[in-house]
Amino acid sequence: MGATTSTTGTSRGGRGARERILRAAKELFYTRGIHATGVAALIEAAHVSPRTFYVHFPTKNALVEEYLRRFESQTPIAAEAELGRDDLPPAQRLLAIFAPVEGEPTALFRGCPFHNAVIEGAGELPEIARLAERHKQAFRDRLVATAAEAGAADPAALGRQLAVIFEGANALAASCNDAQVFTDARRAAKTLLDVALGSAPGG
């Protein structure tokens, strides 16, 4: 995602104001962080007045909640899109979630917006924590379902273990700004899948 904060339109109110605020939140919260992004920056990026901002979002936390809901419904995480592919068999879809992150080599890897929001909330934003928990559980459920499609003897265990590898890789890649972590994660996942599915090593 780029670091630009410009939005379309210059009207400070009107029917498009809510969308401009949400677009600004998606850009700034993800690239700068929730705490580092003040309301003033959001107002400036969205080209709205303070009054208009608070009409749509009485608190910053209300905007954070809607930002995550919008992210979930309109911007699928790349790994989730891989699980939905119909051109790969189930086992390959499970490996595809560990594909290296594409983008500029110098770009910061920001990781999962839900994970980031929970960490920044530090237990003080319970509704945001619930949104993130629901999202992560849904992702684990998809991994379990795909593991069952692949023929795993214990799909629940395999799905949970793959989730641990994936979430750990996301966190480490974001902490170290090193997307190559996913290469190691993919190798670990491949070993796990070979054992769980009874595949021959090196296949």
Specify the residue positions occupied by each region the protein language model found.
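Short coil/turn segments at alpha/beta junctions that flank glycine-rich nucleotide-binding fingerprints
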Residues: 31-35, 108, 150
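Helix-turn-helix
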Residues: 2, 20, 24-62, 66
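Short, basic, alpha-helical segments at the C-terminal edge of helix-turn-helix-like DNA-binding modules
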Residues: 69-75
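Amphipathic alpha-helical segments used for helix-helix packing
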Residues: 93, 106-130
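Hydrophobic alpha-helical segments that form the core
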Residues: 154-175, 184, 188-192
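N-terminal intrinsically disordered/low-complexity leader segments
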Residues: 1-16, 197-203
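Hydrophobic alpha-helical connector segments
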Residues: 66, 80-109, 155, 159-162
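Amphipathic alpha-helical packing segments from all-alpha helical-bundle domains
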Residues: 76, 82, 92-96, 124-149, ...
